[in-house]
A protein has these predicted regions:
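N-terminal capping segment at the start of a domain
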Residues: 1-35
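Soluble extramembrane regions of membrane proteins in the secretory/endomembrane system
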Residues: 20, 24, 39, 54, ...
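Surface-exposed loop and adjacent secondary-structure segments within mature catalytic domains
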Residues: 84-89, 172-214
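A conserved hydrophobic secondary-structure block that centers on an alpha-helix together
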Residues: 118-188
Length: 214
């Protein structure tokens, strides 16, 4: 019976073993091109072969831009310089292993040096710009700051550009994923105060994946 098959399948899964695999894979920064990412691939390959699977590692050259320098400063009415770093978390030894860690950025972000007034655009989605227009707020020539959420991150800088903005900052609002939701990690599941999201803002409708891959 399907239920019996499902029960036998569930019994073959060890949550302790899976937890060990996840901790091993996440023990070091493991983004594309990172040494630990390669180690994870080789470890997974060895595991698959041990299970009797016909497996191999395929190698692809992909376009993966990383910045040489990232900075964010407020210049008026008072000066503030963002640290753009994630502090080690007490109780989590892996959080201090930052040798191969990516900086606080999103892949395919714009390159340049921009200084302009700042405009808050909520989530930076179409309805938010309509609301700003009704209030007489123009983002042309401004830097917009938008919350993560309510839409894919890549839409936020694109919509900002479409409305004439010269820059876009995306941040994680604690109201959405922080202490208002749960206790911060490691006590709870919420994002730590210094946690930074990373990802891509490539134009997915135009490039649904690696821009160099047919």
């Amino acid at each position: 019976a399907p239920a019996d098959i499902e029960s036998r399948f569930d019994a073959s899964i060890s949550s302790k073993e899976m937890d060990g695999w996840m901790k091993k894979m996440a023990a070091e920064p493991n983004h594309v091109g990172a040494p630990h990412n390669r180690a994870n691939a080789e470890d997974t390959l060895a595991r698959f072969k041990a299970w009797g699977w016909d497996a191999k590692i395929e190698t692809f050259d992909v376009l993966y831009p990383t910045p040489t320098r990232v900075s964010l400063d407020l210049v008026t009415p008072r000066r503030f310089k963002a640290t753009l770093t994630e502090r080690p978390i007490p109780g989590d030894a892996t959080s201090s292993r930052t040798r191969d860690q990516l900086p606080a950025y999103v892949a395919f972000q714009g390159d340049g040096d921009v200084t302009a007034p700042l405009v808050y655009v909520n989530y930076g989605m179409p309805d938010d710009y309509k609301a700003l227009e009704r209030m007489g707020v123009d983002v042309k020539g401004k830097i917009v700051i938008a919350r993560y959420g309510q839409g894919w991150r890549g839409l936020k800088p694109k919509l900002a550009q479409d409305h004439g903005a010269v820059g876009c900052i995306i941040y994680s609002d604690p109201r959405d994923d922080g202490f208002s939701v749960d206790d911060a990690y490691p006590k709870g599941a919420a994002r730590p105060a210094q946690g930074v999201q990373r990802g891509s803002v490539a134009d997915m409708p135009l490039y649904p994946g690696d821009p160099l891959t047919p």
